């Protein structure tokens, strides 16, 4: 029963895709200006994604090392994964707490 439901959805989706592509092809053939704009925008997207990819390959490790430090500090230089001691409210020691001095 589930297979027929999925089959119907896939058939409808493929029908919609075919209708869209045939309509797109008709528009493409009838309007040179739309085709030129589409090619221009598609080229711009491809060029931008290529530039981003090349920049990431070049500068990615540097950016990654700035934001994800390895070592004692944990991620982003914050608290380590395992705290050295329990927080003050769970501490059983009687050490004095540091207070703000004015």
Swiss-Prot record:
Membrane topology: Single-pass membrane protein
One Pfam family in the UniProt entry: T_cell_tran_alt
Transmembrane regions listed in the UniProt entry: 36-56
One GO biological process term: osteoclast fusion
Subcellular location: Membrane
Lineage top rank: taxon: Eukaryota
Keyword field: Membrane, Transmembrane, Transmembrane helix
Coiled coil feature spans: none
Major location category of this protein: membrane
GO cellular component, one term: membrane
The keyword S-adenosyl-L-methionine belongs to this UniProt entry's keyword annotation: no
UniProt cross-references to InterPro entries, sorted A to Z: TCTA
Family: Belongs to the TCTA family.
Name this polypeptide is given: T-cell leukemia translocation-altered gene protein homolog
Organism: Xenopus laevis
Underlying gene: tcta
